[in-house]
Every structure is written in C-alpha cells, then in structure tokens.
Regions:
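Membrane-targeting and insertion segments and their boundary/processing signals
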Residues: 8-19, 36-39, 127-130, 145
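YjeF_N-associated NAD(P)HX repair module
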Residues: 1-28, 32, 153, 173
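Glycine-rich phosphate/dinucleotide-binding loop and adjoining beta-alpha-beta core of small-molecule
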Residues: 1, 55-178
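Short low-complexity stretches enriched in small and charged residues
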Residues: 6-11, 28-31, 47-55, 102-110
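Substrate-binding N-lobe of the ribokinase-like
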Residues: 17-79
Length: 178
C-alpha cells in the first residue's frame, strides 16, 4: 500500500464537525516506569483521527501525560474498580502498551476484557495485554470478533506456544494458525 492508497480511503471531515463526531478512544497503558507507552499510545490515537482520547494509566504518569498532551483526558488508576466508570464511554479501546504480568495489569485487563466482550466494543490488544492472555485466569474470556491482536514475533511465539524462529519462518501462516 502506498500513502496515496491510504489517503484516498480516509474519510474527509465535514467543516462543521467537532471532536465528538469522530469517536471516543479509551487507552489503558503504562504500568509503573512505563508512562511513555501511555503517552505514545494516546498521541497515536489523536494523530490517527480519534475525536476524544482518554488514557487510564498509573497515577505517577498523569502529570507527564497531561504536560505532553493536554488534549488527552488522563486518569490515574490503582485497581480494576477505578476503571469501571470509564468502561461505557468509548467507541473503541486499546490496551496493553506498558502493561506487565503483575496484579495491577491482570485485574484491570480482566475487567476490561469481560466488559468489551459483553458489549462488543472494538478492541486492540498489544504488548503486555497479549502476554497476559496466555495466563490461566484469562482462559474463560472469549474475545469478540472486533478484537485485533498486534503481537511482535516474541509475543506471538508466547501466545502460540512455539519458538520465535517458527514464527519468523512464516508470519502469515503463524497468524492464521492462532
């Protein structure tokens, strides 16, 4: 695909449209020490056309996120209950950048995945969220059809329980096998 191919498929915005007309993206990212993952993810949401972007991250990353991107709504979350009031807000969700295999990430991701599956909210799972999916606690969660997984070869190998070099031999075949 060329840039021109992509550009011609991006819908033009009406002159009288406003941010509320262009979708609400919820991002859950950035465990302790990895606030940049949330910052970069929220910037990407803005740059790719989301009208409203809300970032849920560790409390310690809120100030840096707001300083860098004041147009992003940022909230610090300490546990899964802290995300509940935000779950009905988005049109789409991104989760995983800067998340790890720890209690904070596990409880938040679990609550999120149950909600998006029950409500068919389009969801992109990346990085730490993908690694957590292989945990036994997540085995009963069914991802809905509007879930996109974006693993790099190491994450794909872990998810498929095969060696990275097997992924690298034929990425397309590996993706289809999962």
């Amino acid at each position: 695909l060329s840039f021109e191919d992509i550009k011609k498929n991006i819908p033009k915005r009406r002159e009288n449209s406003h941010k509320g007309d262009h979708g609400k993206l919820l991002i859950i990212a950035g465990d302790e020490g990895f606030g940049g993952a949330g910052i970069m993810s929220s910037e990407s949401g803005l740059k790719t056309g989301a009208g409203l972007v809300k970032l849920l991250t560790r409390q310690s990353h809120v100030s840096a996120s707001l300083a860098r991107n004041p147009e992003v709504m940022v909230s610090g979350v300490d546990n899964a209950q802290d995300i509940e009031t935000n779950l009905d807000w988005p049109d789409a969700v991104v989760a995983g950048p800067g998340m790890f295999q720890n209690y904070w990430s596990e409880q938040i991701l679990y609550k999120l995945l149950v909600h998006v599956a029950d409500n068919n909210i389009p969801t992109l799972l990346d990085a730490g969220a993908l690694r957590l999916l292989s945990h036994k606690a997540f085995s009963k969660i069914k991802l809905h059809n509007e879930t996109v997984l974006t693993p790099h070869p190491g994450e794909a190998a872990e998810m498929l329980n095969i060696a990275v070099n097997e992924i690298q031999k034929d990425r397309i075949k590996s993706a289809k096998s999962g």
